[in-house]
């Protein structure tokens, strides 16, 4: 029985070998597919964009230059803004200081009228009448003089200075000429007479002195 089975197996082997032999058509198809795949990869490789190193460097350099220009422009704007801010701060500070210094000039002008009245009052009193023989007039005169001195001290304390330019060179910024007259022995262009004293507040003319100016004969 076993010998019979062996003989049958030997007879079947050639047929089985033929059945498992690959078909030439299938082999050809597989080869074509493989070749097509390789060709496709090659085509895709050819389609990939190629980057020129020199072109990339040029682009980066242009971007660098552009960014540097933008940075420079921004810094210039920043510096100008800082300068404008500093100028504004200084102007504001100056305005505040001037307001402190000259904010009282309206009040000072009103007080000048009082000082003028006191000065005229003391000048109107005859000096020969001020004696012990007239104690009431003497006391009144001395009170006026003390008041005038005190008010001038207050003026000086607050930066208000008296301008009495007799004999000084005429200054159009501090003096106002009422007339011109020749005066013997006086230099032309100098102040010969002060009709009304002037005042300056912290170096700024608050009221010009009213004067008569010497002219050539």
UniProtKB/Swiss-Prot annotation:
Molecular function, one GO term: identical protein binding
Which residues are modified to N6-succinyllysine?
94, 120, 215
The cross-references to InterPro entries, in alphabetical order and at most eight, read: GrpE, GrpE_coiled_coil, GrpE_head
| Annotated transmembrane regions | none
**Presence of keyword Transit peptide:** yes
Check the record and name the Pfam families matching this protein.
GrpE
Task: Kindly list the positions at which N6-acetyllysine occurs in this protein.
Answer: 94, 100, 215
Going by the entry's taxonomy, the superkingdom of the source organism is recorded as Eukaryota
Enumerate the subcellular locations listed in this protein's record, separating them with semicolons. Mitochondrion matrix
Keyword annotations for this protein, in alphabetical order, are:
Acetylation, Chaperone, Mitochondrion, Transit peptide
A single GO BP term for this record reads: protein folding
As listed in the record, the transit peptide stretches over 1-27
Q: Which GO terms describe its cellular component?
A: mitochondrial matrix; PAM complex, Tim23 associated import motor
Please tell me in which tissues this protein is expressed: Ubiquitous. Particularly abundant in heart, kidney and liver.
PROSITE patterns linked: GRPE
Alphabetical list of PANTHER family matching this protein: GRPE PROTEIN, GRPE PROTEIN HOMOLOG 1, MITOCHONDRIAL
Q: Which family does the UniProt entry place this protein in?
A: Belongs to the GrpE family.
Q: What do we know about how this protein assembles, alone or with others?
A: Probable component of the PAM complex at least composed of a mitochondrial HSP70 protein, GRPEL1 or GRPEL2, TIMM44, TIMM16/PAM16 and TIMM14/DNAJC19. Binds to HSP70, HSC70 and HSJ1B.
> What's this chain's function?
Essential component of the PAM complex, a complex required for the translocation of transit peptide-containing proteins from the inner membrane into the mitochondrial matrix in an ATP-dependent manner. Seems to control the nucleotide-dependent binding of mitochondrial HSP70 to substrate proteins.
Q: What is this protein called?
A: GrpE protein homolog 1, mitochondrial
From what organism does this protein derive?
Rattus norvegicus (Rat)
